[in-house]
Amino acid sequence: MAKGQTLQDPFLNALRRERIPVSIYLVNGIKLQGQIESFDQFVVLLKNTVSQMVYKHAISTVVPARIPQNYLPQQAGEDMAEIED
């Protein structure tokens, strides 16, 4: 598995599990909103009034409405520990 997906998959999965609303910005500037219904190596299925299959190579940014509970990537956890000390 590529190193990039070790961060990407748990993040997307937490957003999916908790049904957190997200804004997905595409590389062409279009903003899509909805909830992540499913995802795989190449696509994200975004559900709003309709379901849209969005290719990951077209995604620039994923902005959740809130941070998933109990989600703290290992690197971010180390950074937070330094801040709290």
From Swiss-Prot:
Superkingdom of the organism of origin: Bacteria
Domain Sm, first and last residues per copy: 9-68
Protein name: RNA-binding protein Hfq
Any one biological process term the GO annotation gives: regulation of translation, ncRNA-mediated
Pfam families assigned: Hfq
GO CC, one annotated term: cytosol
Keywords: RNA-binding, Stress response
Family: Belongs to the Hfq family.
NCBIfam families attached to this UniProt entry: Hfq (TIGR02383), PRK00395.1 (NF001602)
Keyword Ion transport: no
